[in-house]
Regions:
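Charge-dense, helix-prone N-terminal extensions
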Residues: 1-128
């Protein structure tokens, strides 16, 4: 299990990350672009689950490079990573933190950061 405090520490290890709030929830951004954020389910999200039980516990949304990367992330971590209809066509995955170990969210945060970071900053980071 991963907590939001651990997510905050992982995000803070990346260059030029700012932690703030979006819609009252924690969010992490680089150059003004959010790459990860706390994403509780809305009433509409809950209704869309119908008779199925929604994933429980804290949910983290993480940007990905594109929809192909989204599908790859979902396939690689099917127990912890998922999506909902609200995210159809949007390059982001959801992570059920109670089912995640530290490594996949750390890698996904880095990928999300790379998707949102200015090219120069991303290039410098990758050159390390």
């Amino acid at each position: 299990m991963v907590t939001f405090d651990e997510v905050a520490r992982m995000a803070a290890e990346l260059p030029d990350v700012a932690e703030g709030r979006s819609h009252g929830n924690r969010a992490w951004s680089v150059a003004g672009k959010a790459f990860a954020w706390e994403r509780p389910f809305s009433k509409a999200d809950i209704r869309r689950f119908g008779d199925a039980t929604p994933p429980a516990g804290p949910i983290l949304a993480i940007r990905v490079e594109d929809l192909g990367e989204k599908e790859a992330a979902l396939a690689a971590q099917p127990k912890a990573f998922f999506t909902i209809p609200h995210f159809d066509g949007y390059a982001a995955v959801l992570v059920q933190l109670t089912k995640a170990t530290k490594r996949p969210p750390r890698e996904a945060l880095t990928d999300g950061w790379l998707a949102c970071a200015p090219p120069r900053l991303a290039k410098e980071f990758l050159a390390r």
